[in-house]
Amino acid sequence: QFEDEKCIARQTMPAPAQLLAELYREDNGKNTDTVYPDHEQLIQDIAVAYRTVIQELYAAGCRNIQFDDCTWGMIGDPNYQNFLKESNTKVEDVAAEYLRLNNLALENRPEGLTITTHVCRGNYHSTWASEGDYFTVAPFLLAQENVDAFYLEFDDARSGSFEPLGLVTTKSPRLENKDTVIARIHEAEKYIPLDRLCLSPQCGFASCEIGNKLTELEQWNKLKLVKEIAETVWGK
């Protein structure tokens, strides 16, 4: 009921690394350690749970899954990096663990199943939770995570300088200039072939119950703009 010849339904879910991060957020870690005194066993059980769900979704007909993952946005945030430093924790060690867990969950996935990931920086009522560039996480996330595509937030300067990206924000009703976005896409060709690039909104329009500061019509106008640009660049 969610698909037709032009549309493929997508199932989104928190990334395995996101689940792990939530299990240790603030005081959650005490309860988690009580249930899982062996941290490696927790890693393995999360991976098995995700592999099971992925197989079940595929059996039910799902062919497109997206991991929503705030962990990489946090790792790139200077404030979070300072927090880790004060905790005598290396940023590289955290990134390596998140990468390993996500890839464990992706093992033995069914043929013909597309799995992508969206690096989210928070999207509460047109605000955000983290900022900073992608250079800290790029050697882990972009170079080694075994997904088919990355949906990366980059709608203003808070995301740092990252030349291949130019996206359409979901936090503001203002429509981006079509020619400017197209120019950014072609700029990205300096780094990645055009047939490996895609255009999407920067995040969801309602990542929480209250949603962002856009009307329904303004949201549809954003999606219409994305569609028009995609057809101009890649064809219908």
Can you say where each PLM-predicted feature lies in the sequence?
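Domain-level signal for soluble alpha/beta catalytic cores
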Residues: 1-236
